UniProtKB/Swiss-Prot annotation:
PROSITE patterns: ZF_FYVE. Belongs to the lst-2 family. This is Lateral signaling target protein 2 homolog. Negative regulator of epidermal growth factor receptor (EGFR) signaling. The keyword Translocase does not apply. Residues 571-611 have a biased composition (Basic residues). Zn(2+) 2 binds at residues 926, 929, 956, 959. Residues 308-462, 508-527, 539-642, 749-900 are annotated as: Disordered. It comes from Drosophila yakuba (Fruit fly).
Length: 984
């Protein structure tokens, strides 16, 4: 008897309830599995392949329906699956559940994943538990299908007092937990899953992208409209700008190249070498150059900058710095916290007792007075000899050597990002720093001084420093198609290794041979190099940086200590002020930027520092000072100082290798764009997730949201196979739909609500207020006292123009002011009628793009909101009523603008029956309210004379009832009102 009842309760094929759908899907799966077990798959491989494909499809269907049942029964008791955030995007597919079930059955049967034998052995017990639990759930669900199924029910109707229902509930909970554990284990074994650190780094990358976008919007590189419209160009612009911002602006963020490589995000880890080179060059750009580069990365426009090559500070120098370098330096020094404690520029005006101070004073005076004396130094034969000492100097002539000026950093973003690589040099005219009086120094004392300061430790440190430089800078760049990014950062005529290493290496072998020529080879850069090195040592304040850890140590510290004895407090307070002004972090090399003039950093080599130092040393003080230096030498501290100075020289030297600023910016553009565009290929899924989050966070909030009820969960996988009759029924009135499509352009429709309209229509109109456009309405022969609704059912249709007027405000203001000239309007009636006719002819031909006349048309460029749209429409109608000549002989006619259509993307369901739209269930717009309905809810048709639609068009059922039932009564009332208005 029970079997007979079960047979009677078996779900029908057309039953759309969840239990019925599960019943038929499970039966199909069982049939395929039985057929697959009935023959030898090795004998018939083609048939086996087809059946396996059908098996996996049926498994997907069964698990999808089971998932819907668990959603309804378990609800919040389901096992969390937050781990899916660590999965690659391509793994999260619709058939993931079927793949997991198939893999669990294979593992339970004894097979193993290829090249994953260890993981397969560990997962096998879990896979067996999953298959067993799923089999139990299938049996219980089949039993419920035969006992408690309600045909075509959208919800489950289970007997809560039945023990099998409670058993089903517990079985579903166990299966859900086991299946979630197996999903994490199986996917982790098959693909690379992000660790916790990698996932957090990806989130930080998203924060960087968002901050970059907000910064680009703030400085005008991008527009908010592009973000709101999801402009595809932003998919390329944002990653490019993020690289620049992450390396320069937010230097301590996720693109901090100083952190270990394993802590860097996996997205940028392959590009670490090239990013370091890009960072070093970016830090030498000023504000103007950085803005030009970012604009180039956004728009791909030509570089439009004429900044000379010498401008290499992160902040653009002010005109005062360029025109008056000495004056600006003195002002910067005097405006500090202690006016009497400054660098050697201000020291020359207060201290002149010692020989060192006299030498510095002569150098500064010579720089101030000899801006145009470059011809002498360019013809000096000793300059050529000094230039040949380093290959890095071959590309520059003394006439092109700019002097450095202090470039204070007003913006905290660049001051944080700036390091010693941003050794400043501005566009000041070159100065001749040579002084004939200094050539009287004794060369023999210099040679003896050099030989006494050499040591074996210095040789070892020099070799190690050279190895570190070669290892850091000679690494190959990350490849893009047909391009080496590492080589792109080098000039075409200079090899990669010559950029940073050649000057030090070649100088090592040539300095001893030219030791006696140190005082004779003075040029602008060498004298400036002495001051730069001396000030650098003063600012760093190393306790024992007396000895230079190079192969040819110099007496820079001797000069420094000689200057420090009378002004030790001055230097200390100056160094403190420098750190407070620029907010530098713990790196020592950060404390000597943007404060004092440096020579051309390309020429500030070891030999240059040696020669310049010896110029300022009094011969009588060399021997005691040198003994004091040797007594307090610290090799490690001096080595750290040498690394910092070398880093600054290397970075600025790399910039000076390029022919022009345009060439440098172009190289940076190619490299940055190459790295950013490769992210689109190598990390497409991660980049899509980041950009999606960035767009959602930074898009402007919608002005008005359409209230559409949420869809029910049980109908997410609703299967609907439309028959021929269904298709015909749902597309009923196809001719009307074609007519509607020809008659109305939804993009140009306006939200319009007449004063006498009902509230329901106004609500539908307000739902599409965001689609409002500037429409103009022509009203002819309108009575002065007639209401806007009094002409809605007139027989004649006035012309409706949809135009984007450029003078909407002027037309609206003139229409408002026309009330004061009513009598003049009456006298000029004939002239106005002629203007109306001409305006209509132009609108019929090409459309009106000019401001409409106040007497004929009125624009609707009000605020984009439903309230202002409706109130503005009333004002426009009233203004037009006042401007028209009252006449009892003419009939009233007014045509309203059709309502805006709700976009298809904002209406996933029918607004009447809430049925989701599918490939067969089409969307239809009601011409009266603009709503989106299915074919069943919008199969009515009626003419809409108030919109100028005399033919029957598609309307929804609610609008059809209102229009048909109230049409005659409203028309009669309107006629009475029109007669009364004309009589008055």
């Amino acid at each position: 008897m029970d079997t007979f009842k079960r047979w009677l309760n078996k779900p029908k094929a057309d039953d759309k309830s969840l239990l019925a759908r599960f019943f038929h899907a499970d039966r199909s799966l069982t049939a395929v599995a039985s057929e697959l077990d009935s023959f030898d798959g090795r004998a018939e491989p083609d048939r086996c392949t087809r059946l396996v494909s059908r098996l996996r499809q049926n498994q997907d269907k069964v698990l999808a329906i089971t998932n819907l049942i668990m959603e309804e029964l378990l609800g919040e008791d389901r096992d969390p699956r937050a781990f899916r955030a660590k999965f690659p995007e391509e793994v999260l597919q619709e058939n993931l559940a079927g793949q997991l079930w198939f893999g669990a059955e294979c593992l339970a049967a004894g097979s193993s994943i290829m090249n994953r034998e260890t993981e397969s052995k560990e997962m096998r017990p879990l896979a067996q538990a999953v298959t067993k639990s799923l089999g139990n759930v299938r049996v219980l669900l089949r039993d419920q299908c035969l006992k408690n199924n309600v045909p075509n029910s959208k919800t489950l109707h289970l007997d809560l007092n039945d023990s099998t229902t409670e058993q089903l509930y517990e079985s579903l909970k166990i299966f859900d937990r086991l299946f979630a554990e197996f999903e994490l284990s199986y996917v982790s074994a098959m693909v690379q899953v992000k660790s916790r650190h990698e996932y957090e780094m990806q989130q930080w990358i998203g924060v960087l992208f968002s901050e970059t976008l907000q910064r680009a919007l703030k400085i005008g590189l991008l527009d908010q409209e592009m973000v709101d419209a999801f402009d595809p160009g932003l998919m390329f612009s944002i990653p490019r700008l993020a690289i620049v911002a992450g390396l320069v602006v937010y230097a301590k963020g996720p693109l901090n190249m100083d952190m270990p490589g394993d802590q860097l995000s996996e997205m940028f880890r392959p590009f670490r070498t090239i990013l370091i080179k890009i960072r070093d060059l970016l830090r030498n750009l000023n504000n103007q150059e950085l803005y030009q580069l970012e604009k180039l990365l956004c728009t791909n426009e030509d570089i439009n900058t004429k900044v000379p090559l010498g401008s290499s500070s992160i902040e653009a120098p002010s005109p005062e710095h360029s025109a008056h370098p000495t004056t600006s330096s003195s002002q910067n020094n005097n405006n500090s916290s202690n006016n009497n404690h400054s660098s050697s520029s201000s020291t020359t005006t207060t201290m002149g007792t010692t020989s060192t101070h006299r030498t510095v004073e002569r150098l500064v005076d010579q720089r101030n007075n000899n801006h145009n004396s470059n011809s002498n130094s360019s013809t000096n034969p000793t300059v050529e000899g000094a230039t040949l000492r380093s290959p890095s100097m071959l590309s520059l002539s003394p006439t092109s050597t700019p002097t450095a000026s202090p470039a204070p950093s007003p913006t905290p973003s660049h001051s944080i990002a700036s390091t010693s690589s941003a050794a400043t040099s501005s566009t000041n005219p070159p100065a001749d720093w040579s002084d004939g009086d200094d050539e009287d120094e004794d060369d023999d004392d210099i040679e003896v001084d050099e030989e006494d300061l050499e040591s074996s430790d210095d040789d070892t440190d020099e070799e190690q420093l050279l190895k570190d430089i070669v290892a850091a800078d000679c690494a190959s760049g990350y490849l893009i198609p047909n391009t080496n990014l590492g080589n792109l950062l080098q000039p075409q005529e200079v090899p990669l290794t010559d950029n940073f290493v050649a000057s030090e290496d070649d100088e090592y072998g040539t300095t001893e041979q030219q030791g006696h020529q140190g005082l004779e080879e003075e040029e602008p850069s060498t004298s400036a190099a002495m001051l730069a090195a001396t000030r650098t040592l003063q600012r760093l304040r190393l306790p024992s940086s007396d000895t230079e850890p190079l192969a040819e140590p110099t007496t820079i510290k001797a000069t420094e200590e000689h200057m420090q004895q009378p002004s030790g407090r001055h230097r200390e307070s100056h160094s403190h002020r420098h750190h407070q002004r620029h907010h530098h972090h713990h790196h020592h090399r950060h404390s000597h930027q943007h404060q004092h003039r440096q020579p051309h950093p390309h020429r500030t080599t070891r030999s240059g520092r040696k020669r310049c130092s010896l110029e300022a040393v009094d011969p009588e003080t060399i021997q005691p000072e040198r003994e004091q230096n040797l007594a307090s030498g610290d090799t490690s501290a001096a080595s750290s100082l040498s690394d910092d100075v070398s880093l600054a020289m290397r970075n600025t030297t790399a910039r000076l290798k390029f022919k022009s600023t345009e060439n440098l910016l172009h190289r940076l553009f190619v490299c940055i764009a190459g790295v950013a565009d490769q992210l689109q290929t190598n990390f497409a899924s991660d980049l899509r997730q980041i950009l999606r989050s960035v767009f959602l966070m930074n898009m402007s909030s919608a002005q008005e949201e359409i209230d559409i009820p949420e869809k029910t969960k049980e109908s997410e996988l609703f299967e609907f196979r439309a028959s021929e009759n269904d298709v015909i029924q749902e597309s009923a009135g196809s001719n009307q739909s074609i007519y509607s499509a020809e008659e109305v352009n939804p993009e140009l429709d306006n939200v319009f609500s007449a004063g006498g309209g009902n509230q329901a229509t106004g609500q539908r109109h307000s739902a599409g207020a965001s689609m409002q456009r500037n429409n103009t309405i022509d009203l002819a022969n309108q009575p002065g006292e007639g209401s806007p609704s009094g002409a809605t059912m007139a027989t004649s249709r006035s012309h409706v123009t949809r135009s984007r007027s450029l003078g909407d405000q002027e037309a609206a203001s003139s229409a408002t002011s026309s009330t004061a000239h009513l009598r003049q309007q009456e006298q000029q009636q004939q002239h106005q009628q002629l203007q109306i006719q001409l305006q209509r002819q132009r609108n019929n031909s090409v459309g009106s793009n000019t401001p409409s006349s106040a007497s004929s048309t009125s624009s609707s460029s009000e605020q984009n909101s439903p309230v202002s749209a409706r109130s503005g429409s009333r004002r426009r109608l009233q203004s037009n009523n006042e401007t028209q000549m009252p006449s009892s002989a003419t009939s009233t006619s007014a045509t309203l603008s059709p309502p805006a259509w709700i976009p298809d993307g904002k209406a996933p369901r029918c607004m009447a029956c809430q049925t989701p739209f599918t490939a067969f269930r089409r969307r239809h717009h009601c011409r009266n309210c603009g709503g989106v309905f299915c074919g069943v809810c919008s199969n009515a048709s009626a003419p809409l004379p108030k919109y100028g639609l005399t033919k029957a068009v598609r309307v929804c059922r609610d609008c059809y009832v209102r229009e048909v039932r109230s049409g005659m009564g409203v028309q009669g009332v309107q006629r009475v009102q029109s007669v009364q208005a004309s009589a008055s």
